[in-house]
UniProtKB/Swiss-Prot annotation:
This is DNA-directed RNA polymerase subunit beta. GO terms for molecular function: DNA binding; DNA-directed RNA polymerase activity; ribonucleoside binding. The modification N6-acetyllysine is found at K1022, K1200. It comes from Shigella dysenteriae serotype 1 (strain Sd197). InterPro entries: DNA-dir_RNA_pol_bsu_ext_1_sf (IPR042107), DNA-dir_RNA_pol_bsu_external_1 (IPR019462), DNA-dir_RNA_pol_su2 (IPR015712), DNA-dir_RNAP_su2_dom (IPR007120), DNA-dir_RNAP_su2_hyb_sf (IPR037033), RNA_pol_bsu_bac (IPR010243), RNA_pol_bsu_CS (IPR007121), RNA_pol_bsu_protrusion (IPR007644).
Length: 1342
């Protein structure tokens, strides 16, 4: 395997046995691709904005004299970049400009004669843009649009599984779901009549819709039934025989023909009888006259002579009717073929309950059902029905819907119209009747072939279309009203409805969520989440068990592990590692093609529908060198079931062992040894890990760490290869390799790093360079680590030395005992950044003022403020300190004569303002790391604002000029090369000032041209620099666009350092979570024979019942990894020669059959080996991929190599007594995470605070400064102890007895500790509620 310079710094030993056929795809592509489709110009007009415009335009006036046509659109440049939008609290968006053409036709002239054409570009609002990391910045906060899993449009056949009717009869139904428009349902009732519902309203007989489609009774019967033909000959009744129809019937008379009896009366007709009849080619048989009674006539029969209707279609025949028919000369009678087995009389029966008899009455009936209470007219009824399913404006199946519809009805073509046709409706009814007759199956709604993904782009397009449709109405009216000669397109269009619809979607849709930004993994998982909730989806309450359950089609598409615990379980899922969506929005997963029993490296993506037709082997099937299966029988999946197949039956093979799981679950080593429930907790808890002060890569990983860290976008990744030319804490400059440069550019890439910014969850985002000056880098190398990444690998926690043993009850019930060393070394110290804002408004009594001159506040309280009244950066503040001084004018109060006198003597006192300063919340203390002042346009900036502005300008100028210098240096080195090649002496050239170089002329024309080109570039560079600086200056100095009535906003950022302490929640990666019970002194911790104490003591009883054995294997393997690191460390300390080091490290990498990754250290230089050793001295990182991990024997081998006991257990000694513990203890290294459930955020105590308005009881919860609820069970406890007075106190003065508690407060202040309980307010509430029921109830005082 070839490693780049940066990758050679630290290589993970990989235990994976299966070769990596397909690299992990870019993990955010589901978001980025979908949005790209939405905004990029699509010439076909299938997707995105283009499709939305084409579906609404052209808009014609009601008279048809004019129309507004759409030509094209373009997105402008965003005003602010992403960072500026976050700081200013605005939306990162681009203006949408649309070119429209207004065409006016001549009124009197023949059709289509154009009178006037006007074309103009019109502004149509702002479209939020996606950042490079798949998020949106809306009002300054990063949000994610979660993809939705919804029912695909199309037709679905289902049954109620016998739950509706008491008899348990299974009722079948069909439902046509369009992408937009009315739903059409067909359903059977218990009497086997077929009904139709439109939009889930009341049901009508299904034949009404056929009559509305202009079918007569005869035509309807013709469509759905085969005919039985009777002929009357010589007063005998004969029937045309179709032998196949007789199968399974019992003969009610002798079946004979040509004097031969084929079946005797009462006998059952078998296949043998039918063969006999067919062989003798029997066409007609004689039947008794009674046989025809009860048969149903297939068409109208009229008496030719009188014109009288003898019997209408769908009437039952009786012997009298037969006689009448015979008399009037009808010798041939067509009846419907029905039987109880597989040709039910459903449509015939339905026609009998159908009240309508022609098209108009059917349309009226449908109109009455859709619009009850409105008087129907013919036109209204016709247009309503037409608009329901046959109008492109109101109804659209979409390409997906049409494809699913045609596939479901087994049609050849998969494309077609977006509206329904007569055939569509009839075919659906036919198939439903077939299913009722026992032919065909119902659909499985939870099958992923029937559910599709709706991603950002599609949802934004739908929202945009909604806005456009609103605009369409207004445009139509304007086209009809106005004087068209003077109007321009922009007078027609009002952009408000469009931007309102888009804004509403991005700002407040259920699927537009505040991004979970705890750590890089939680960001990535949030963007790959798939929700079944949201508009057009399910609701938590209605979702049953089946929808939430794991379905066989989830394999490789949706993760069976990662889903929230609680009410949303199974409704919110995560995309599997390799899954992607196809053009129709269905999830697909990759497989390797198997041809003639040989597994190839050809990759095919299959959707759930296609997968059902193949036999697919698992990824861990053993193959030989050529790719043949080793075993004769291979475990495979086919049609959702797993079983053994012979090797030549296999069609495909899984791509990778981690194909089944999501990114979160693929980061859990030894996942295959954990119980599923615990794995779920492990995957979910990794997302809650807080980035530690110094990230520490996991010793035992799965090899997915690098992919997650790079794709999450928190690291700085090299866009092109080159050499590091400059590096400091906030910038990295790369001189690009010659072969990767664009022609005529300076070849310098500058990466500005993010420093100490706040994430959505108040954790700290900070990037630190991990390359040094002069190092070569390649494209895709990590240049700087972000939060929770270490050398470009995801590092959510710390490697801790753990021991599994009880310790004095401090690890009872999942508690965790932690050594003081962990606190001292700041292993789990985290930085949290809080944003506190102070808003100065314009009030009725005058403007609020931000100032240091605050009434009734001592000097000490103002010591941290500057003269503008704003805290200075670097100040250490604690709860209650003033951060921003602000005074609010208060209403004039009536002054007493004494006050008036004092005022007159001492002048104007500051009593007409009240202190409304921003203070640090209680329980928070930290350091001020940044202050930002935003001032409204036209309001004078204070001194602090001007200082900040000046500083920003200085910084911007410094950044830009440094950038310019770097680019200039690159350019001049190329100019020098051209000059020297053109014959100028290098020494003389270096004596000449650089600016004069461009004045030199060369004789060689080609070189002279090159020189002139470079000179042009130089001028352009300087011009560009001036332009950038001017733009920056304008942005910095312009006023801010603040909300109405707001004059100034001051934002103060506090950095809070949180050390680990009892009460904090910690967890491993296997769902093994617990709370810290005690921080133990180092000297009291158990230690080994070398005197090394353990860091954490965990309870062994937490493992067997939970069945997450993965943690034990991880501990052993971690121990081995550390042991090897220790040996390398010892060798480095002894300064042994490189050859020995190289040999030992090579041995470690070669251990276990590494097919996937042969690390060949012979290709490394000595310096590279030394640097690798330096990075391995704390432990050799190991990858053990999911379902393909290290085996027990391999772990033992590795332990042996690290000179450690192969049992993984060692003798420990009690730190307090020095005595050896009775038995050996499992000790090793486990990766522990500190979760974002910190005791500091949860600890809370209430003094007198706010009360609920109605019940007058204290509020609940920390955010409301609430009290602790003394609930029903606590009352029982006091009752049980007979503590009557305590109980009375709890229910009255400590809760909602308003007078009692006020009096009590006064008494306490006076030092009188007595109480008089009164009437609790909740009793009065109860009285009022009873009175509201009309029962007067009064409390009489005795």
């Amino acid at each position: 395997m070839v490693y780049s310079y940066t990758e050679k710094k630290r290589i993970r030993k990989d235990f994976g046995k299966r070769p990596q056929v397909l690299d992990v795809p870019y993990l955010l592509s589901i978001q980025l691709d979908s949005f790209q489709k939405f905004i990029e110009q699509d010439p076909e007009g299938q997707y995105g904005l283009e499709a939305a415009f084409r579906s609404v335009f052209p808009i014609q006036s009601y008279s048809g004299n004019s129309e507004l046509q759409y030509v094209s659109y373009r997105l402008g440049e965003p005003v602010f970049d992403v960072q500026e939008c976050q700081i200013r609290g605005v939306t990162y968006s681009a203006p949408l400009r649309v070119k429209l053409r207004l065409v006016i036709y001549e009124r009197e002239a023949p059709e289509g004669t154009v009178k006037d054409i006007k074309e103009q570009e019109v502004y149509m609002g702002e479209i939020p843009l996606m950042t490079d990391n798949g998020t949106f910045v809306i009002n300054g906060t990063e949000r994610v649009i979660v993809s939705q899993l919804h029912r695909s449009p199309g037709v679905f056949f289902d049954s109620d599984k016998g739950k509706t009717h008491s008899s348990g009869k299974v009722l079948y139904n069909a439902r046509i779901i369009p992408y937009r428009g009315s739903w059409l349902d067909f359903e059977f009732d218990p009497k086997d009549n077929l009904f139709v519902r439109i939009d889930r309203r009341r049901k009508l007989p299904a034949t009404i819709i056929l009559r509305a489609l202009n079918y007569t009774t005869e035509q309807i019967l013709d469509l759905f039934f085969e005919k039985v033909i009777f002929e009357i000959r010589d007063n005998k009744l004969q029937m045309e025989l179709v032998p196949e129809r007789l199968r399974g019937e019992t003969a009610s008379f002798d079946i004979e023909a040509n004097g031969k009896v084929y079946v005797e009366k009462g006998r059952r007709i078998t296949a043998r009888h039918i063969r006999q009849l067919e062989k003798d080619d029997v066409k007609l048989i004689e039947v008794p006259v009674e046989y025809i009674a009860g048969k149903v006539v297939a068409k109208d029969y009229i008496d030719e002579s009188t014109g009288e209707l003898i019997c209408a279609a769908n009437m039952e025949l009786s012997l009298e009717l037969l006689a009448k028919l015979s008399q009037s000369g009808h010798k041939r009678i067509e009846t419907l073929f029905t039987n109880d087995l597989d040709h039910g009389p459903y449509i015939s029966e339905t026609l009998r309950v159908d009240p309508t008899n022609d098209r108009l009455s059917a349309l009226v009936e449908i109109y009455r059902m859709m619009r009850p209470g409105e008087p129907p007219t013919r036109e209204a009824a016709e247009s309503l029905f037409e608009n329901l399913f046959f109008s492109e404006d109101r109804y659209d199946l979409s390409a997906v819907g049409r494809m699913k519809f045609n596939r479901s009805l087994l049609r050849e073509e998969i494309e077609g119209s977006g509206i329904l046709s007569k055939d569509d409706i009839i075919d659906v009814m036919k198939k439903l009747i077939d299913i009722r007759n026992g032919k065909g199956e119902v659909d499985d709604i939870d099958h992923l072939g029937n559910r599709r993904i709706r991603s950002v782009g599609e949802m934004a397009e739908n929202q945009f279309r909604v806005g456009l449709v609103r605009v369409e109405r207004a445009v139509k009216e304007r086209l009809s009203l106005g004087d068209l000669d003077t109007l321009m397109p922009q007078d027609m269009i009002n952009a408000k409805p469009i931007s309102a619809a888009v804004k509403e979607f991005f700002g407040s849709s259920q699927l537009s969520q505040f991004m979970d930004q705890n750590n890089p993994l939680s960001e990535i998982t949030h963007k790959r989440r798939i929700s079944a909730l949201g508009p057009g989806g399910l609701t938590r309450e209605r979702a049953g068990f089946e929808v939430r359950d794991v379905h066989p089609t989830h394999y490789g598409r949706v993760c069976p592990i990662e889903t929230p615990e609680g009410p949303n379980i199974g409704l919110i899922n995560s995309l599997s590692v390799y899954a992607q969506t196809n053009e129709y929005g269905f999830l697909e997963t990759p497989y390797r093609k198997v041809t003639d029993g040989v597994v190839t490296d050809e990759i095919h993506y299959l959707s759930a529908i296609e997968e059902g037709n193949y036999v697919i082997a698992q990824a861990n099937s053993n193959l030989d060198e050529e790719g043949h299966f080793v075993e004769d029988l291979v475990t495979c999946r086919s049609k959702g079931e797993s079983s053994l197949f012979s090797r030549d039956q296999v069609d495909y093979m899984d791509v990778s062992t981690q194909q089944v799981v999501s990114v979160g679950a693929s980061l859990i080593p030894f996942l295959e040894h954990d119980d599923a429930n615990r794995a779920l907790m492990g995957a979910n808890m990794q997302r809650q890990a807080v980035p530690t002060l110094r990230a520490d890569k996991p010793l035992v990983g799965t090899g997915m760490e690098r992919a997650v860290a790079v794709d999450s976008g928190v690291t700085a990744v090299a866009k092109r290869g080159g050499v590091v030319q400059y590096v400091d804490a906030s910038r990295i400059v790369i001189k690009v390799n010659e072969d990767e440069m664009y022609p005529g550019e300076a070849g310098i890439d500058i990466y500005n790093l993010t420093k100490y910014t706040r994430s959505n969850q108040n954790t700290c985002i900070n990037q630190m360079p991990c390359v040094s000056l002069g190092e070569p880098v390649e494209r895709g190398d990590v240049l700087a680590d972000g939060p929770s990444t270490d050398l470009g690998e995801l590092a959510l926690g710390q490697n801790m030395r753990v021991a599994f043993m009880p310790w004095n009850g401090y690890n009872f019930e999942d508690s965790i005992l932690v050594s003081e060393r962990v606190v001292q070394e700041d292993r789990f110290t985290t930085i949290h950044i809080q944003e506190l804002a102070c808003v100065s408004r314009d009030t009725k009594l005058g403007p609020e003022e931000i100032t240091a001159d605050i009434p009734n506040v001592g000097e000490a309280a103002l010591s941290k403020l500057d003269e503008s009244g704003i805290v200075y950066i670097g100040a250490e503040v604690t709860g209650g300190d003033i951060l921003v001084g602000k005074v609010t004018p208060k209403g004039e109060t009536q002054l007493t004569p004494e006050e008036k006198l004092l005022r007159a003597i001492f002048g104007e006192k500051a009593s007409d303002v009240k202190d409304s300063s921003l203070r640090v919340p209680n329980g928070v203390s930290g350091t001020v790391i940044d202050v930002q002042v935003f001032t409204r346009d036209g309001v004078e900036k204070d001194k602090r604002a001007l200082e900040i502005e000046e500083m920003q300008l200085k910084q911007a100028k410094k950044d830009l000029s440094e950038e310019l210098q770097i680019l200039e240096a690159g350019l001049f080195s190329r100019i020098r090369a051209v000059l020297v090649a053109g014959g100028v002496e290098a020494e003389k050239l270096d004596k000449l000032p650089r600016d004069r170089w461009l004045e030199l002329g060369l004789t060689d024309e080609e070189k002279q041209n090159q020189l002139e080109q470079l000179a042009e570039q130089y001028d352009e560079l300087k011009h560009e620099f001036e332009k950038k600086l001017e733009a920056k200056r304008r942005k910095i100095t312009q006023g801010d666009d603040l909300a109405p009535g707001v004059l100034k906003i001051v934002k103060v950022y506090l950095a809070v350092k949180r050390r680990i302490q009892p009460g904090d929640k910690m967890a491993g990666r296997h769902g093994n979570k617990g709370v810290i019970s005690k921080i133990n002194p180092i000297e009291d911790m158990p230690y080994d024979e070398n005197g090394t104490p353990v860091d954490i003591v965990l309870n062994p009883l937490g493992v067997p019942s939970r069945m997450n054995i993965g943690q034990i294997l991880e501990t052993h393997l971690g121990m081995a990894a550390k042991g090897i690191g220790d040996k390398i460390n010892a060798m480095l300390k002894q300064q042994q020669e490189v050859a020995k080091l190289r040999e030992f490290i090579q041995r470690a990498y070669d251990l276990g059959a590494d097919v996937r990754q042969k690390v060949d250290l012979s290709t490394f230089s000595d310096e590279e080996v030394m640097r690798l050793a330096e990075n391995l001295r704390k432990g050799m990182p190991i990858a053990t991929p999911v379902f393909d991990g290290a085996k027990e024997a391999e772990i033992k081998e590795l332990l042996k190599l690290g000179d450690l006991p192969t049992s993984g257990q060692i003798r420990l000694y009690d730190g307090r007594t020095g005595e050896q513990f009775e038995r050996p203890v499992t000790v090793g290294y486990m990766y522990m995470l500190k979760l974002n459930h910190l005791v500091d955020d949860k600890m809370h105590a209430r003094s007198t605070g706010s009360y609920s308005l109605v019940t007058q009881q204290p509020l609940g919860g920390k955010a409301q400064f609430g009290g602790q609820r003394f609930g029903e069970m606590e009352v029982w406890a006091l009752e049980a102890y007979g503590a009557a007075y305590t109980l009375q106190e709890m229910l009255t003065v400590k809760s909602d007895d308003v007078n009692g508690r006020t009096k009590m407060y006064k008494n306490i202040v006076d030092g009188n500790h007595q109480m008089e309980p009164g009437m609790p307010e909740s009793f009065n509430v109860l009285l009022k509620e009873i009175r509201s029921l009309g029962i007067n109830i009064e409390l009489e005082d005795e």
